[in-house]
Amino acid sequence: MASSLGDNFNLLSPQQQELVKMLLDNGQEHLFRDWPAPGVDDDHKNAFFDQLTRLDSSYPGGLEAYITNAKRLLADSKAGRNPFDGFTPSVPTGETLAFGDENYIKFEEAGVLEARKAAFVLVAGGLGERLGYSGIKLALPAETTTRTCFVQNYIESILALQEASSQGESQTQIPLVIMTSDDTHGRTLELLESNSYFGMQPTQVTLLKQEKVACLEDNDARLALEPQNKYKIQTKPHGHGDVHALLYSSGILKVWYEAGLKWVLFFQDTNGLLFKAIPSALGVSAAKQYHVNSLAVPRKAKEAIGGITRLTHSDGRSMVINVEYNQLDPLLRASGYPDGDVNCETGYSPFPGNINQLILELGHYIEELSKTGGAIQEFVNPKYKDASKTSFKSSTRLECMMQDYPKTLPPSARVGFTVMETWLAYAPVKNNAEDAAKVPKGNPYHSATSGEMAIYRANSIILRKAGVQVADPVVQVFNGQEVEVWPRITWKPKWGLTFNRIKSKVSGNCSISLRSTLAIKGPNIFIENLSVDGALIIDAVDDAEVNVSGSVQNNGWVLETVDYKDASEPEVLRIRGFKFNKIEQLETKYSEPGKFHLKA
């Protein structure tokens, strides 16, 4: 049984011996080949078993399940099996919202009240290297007018929901979980601690670290060893689908359920608009009693974003899931839609675009995870050396995605979606300047440049809908990307959590010129008959009520271009292609409670 280990086998603990037997039974003899006798390399051997134990304990069902799943998926991949065989696609049911109308406001207000029964899970990505930024992505400023980083924006948004949903009763702390990795864990903790958790109680935030999975060297799912170290298995990330198993094994879901929570909201790391969409989507979940609600945006046919689709199998099974755009078109063509993925009379595809933000009903979620242990349907994507598909160019591994959770749900599960306009809900930052500049004209750049400009656009459009005269945008080019430049308007989440709140704080005849910057940093700032042509920064503590009126006219902050190759500029500016030259501004700070009037 353990012959390749020789006398080393007798030195192992009973648990380690069981692990070895299982590995040998599953075709992993090569792991112990050429091991020297006891007394040689013992420290390395112990480290190897520590790693094996870690890999075994962090995967639902252990390494045996991982190897079994890998053999099946690798065989399917080699045979070219299509995971959608037997499924017919159709348009699922969901709710489409138009910002600011009666229906939208109804859901938004309902969602704010529901938020006291919610927990948030931030599936934090890795480092910002792909963006040309050396820090963690959560530390990246969402916009450079106030330099608010993504995680600060998220936490302040959750705290704003926490306060608004309490309605005068004692505040219920809304918990936040952040999934980290080896690369990001320490830096995420440091970012939170050095900023006093951006206003949250440290006990409100839980960091769960994701482990990697073993790499596979061939179609027999033999675990790959490091080329330079026969006592170490190669590992790679398993994907953000791990979040479900981590939440389940941590026991935190049960704690939430016993505390009376009802919703778990999953979101990703660099979408500066996301929380504008969350209250209304949560309101939809509550009204429709959805077990799963995917936030979505209108999507053009064949656009490079997954489509939310109902799949019905010939055996009667059905599910509502995200189908990647490159799979959706051929699937439709093979199912009696000769033109594949085409726009309908709305000008958009009937299959809405998945933006990877999920709202799950907690009780149903726990029930499902107790059956699966949090395991999510996986896939494998080996890079084969040639058409024979017998060997790989480099080792591969199994992967899983958070949004594939509904694949294991029974047909009785209520799975729906909420579509919101892209300008309001979706501006991810995931492409660096060079890659974004190569994006075909008309397609979204998804860069730091477009992400920041999208925040100003959304805030400008919202204020317009609230009755403010906001100047029309102009198109400018930064880092080779044509973007709409609107007035640089920002506010704290506590000021503008919902459309109703914003409307209640803006009155009379207000106007903002194109070259203006307006930063509202306080919840109780009221704007009445205000004209801004320049830069105005108002900072006030929670208990300071400030009424602002009159005419602000100064030289303002001038937008200047920055070359992404200019090493004399900081990374956060280079990746955007612009910076602000702060020539002149009216800046006021109210640090005491009371009522104040700023007449410009």
UniProtKB/Swiss-Prot annotation:
Coiled coil: none
pH influence on activity: Optimum pH is 7.5-9.0.
EC nos: 2.7.7.64
Function: May function as the terminal enzyme of the myo-inositol oxidation (MIO) pathway. May also play a role in the salvage pathway for synthesis of nucleotide sugars.
Signal peptide: none
Annotated protein name in UniProt: UDP-sugar pyrophosphorylase 1
A GO molecular-function annotation: UTP-monosaccharide-1-phosphate uridylyltransferase activity
Keywords: Nucleotidyltransferase, Transferase
Similarity comment: family membership: Belongs to the USP family.
Gene3D superfamilies in alphabetical order: 2.160.10.30, Spore Coat Polysaccharide Biosynthesis Protein SpsA, Chain A
Cofactor(s) required, per the database record: Mg(2+); Mn(2+)
Free-text tissue specificity from the UniProt record: Expressed in root tips, young leaves, flowers and developing embryos.
Reaction it catalyzes: a monosaccharide 1-phosphate + UTP + H(+) = a UDP-monosaccharide + diphosphate
InterPro entries: Nucleotide-diphossugar_trans (IPR029044), UDP-sugar_pyrophosphorylase (IPR039741), UDPGP_fam (IPR002618)
An example Gene Ontology biological process: UDP-N-acetylglucosamine biosynthetic process
